[in-house]
């Protein structure tokens, strides 16, 4: 976001109308970006910072699709949802294959490069979007936040998004937060990018971030 602010004139960006959008790990990063302030996570240099500093990483809208919000809690979440471990293992074989030779037992630990079961309380706070929400956000300074999650997600339990919604609603109010749970949508479900859902997303951005050109499922690049 620092870099986007720095090149705003070159590309015609309006720094007062930034929305940040992420799915899964990107959803986590979107929330932590929108909830942190310019004094946090500022140790990583970006191109042009010496010439253009100070610039802000502030965003006006956060779009979080099924992001993980609390490391080390997913096993408890799935137990609460009564989803057997073998079912989750079968559903996430594609992820397990990716970490097979890394030395980590689960995707969370691989992503953090540390066994999440050994995280200290300070480390949990440092990595948790919920911590930065409680620390930094108020009704006056909070971005608008859209949270979408599927109730058939076997990679990130939807209870993570429910807790995020509950915390945000308490701290910044219902006017700033919109949460939708999609029935029978799995992790990274293609249905989220149907023309109907993209139309709803466009309406949300038009309402909260300013006019957005039409986009459809065929024009979205997903990494």
Q: Where are the regions a protein language model picked out?
A:
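Active-site catalytic pocket residues across diverse enzymes, especially alpha/beta-hydrolases
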Residues: 8, 37-41, 82, 124, ...
């Amino acid at each position: 976001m620092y870099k986007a602010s720095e090149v705003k004139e070159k590309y015609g960006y309006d720094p007062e109308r930034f929305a940040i959008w992420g799915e899964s790990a990107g959803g986590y990063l979107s929330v932590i970006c929108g909830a942190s302030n310019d004094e946090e996570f500022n140790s990583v240099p970006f191109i042009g910072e010496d010439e253009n500093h100070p610039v802000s990483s502030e965003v006006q809208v956060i779009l979080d699709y099924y992001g993980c919000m609390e490391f080390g809690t997913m096993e408890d979440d799935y137990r609460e949802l009564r989803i057997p471990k073998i079912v989750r293992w079968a559903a996430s074989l594609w992820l397990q294959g990716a970490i097979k030779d890394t030395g980590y037992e689960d995707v969370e630990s691989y992503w953090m490069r540390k066994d999440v079961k050994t995280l200290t309380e300070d480390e949990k706070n440092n990595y948790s979007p919920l911590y930065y929400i409680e620390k930094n956000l108020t009704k006056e300074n909070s971005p608008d936040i859209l949270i979408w999650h599927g109730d058939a997600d076997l990679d990130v339990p939807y209870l993570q998004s429910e807790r995020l919604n509950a915390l945000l609603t308490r701290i910044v109010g219902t006017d700033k937060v919109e949460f939708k749970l999609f029935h029978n949508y799995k992790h990274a479900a293609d249905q989220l990018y149907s023309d109907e859902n993209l139309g709803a997303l466009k309406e949300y951005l038009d309402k909260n971030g300013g006019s957005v050109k039409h986009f459809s499922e065929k024009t979205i690049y997903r990494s």
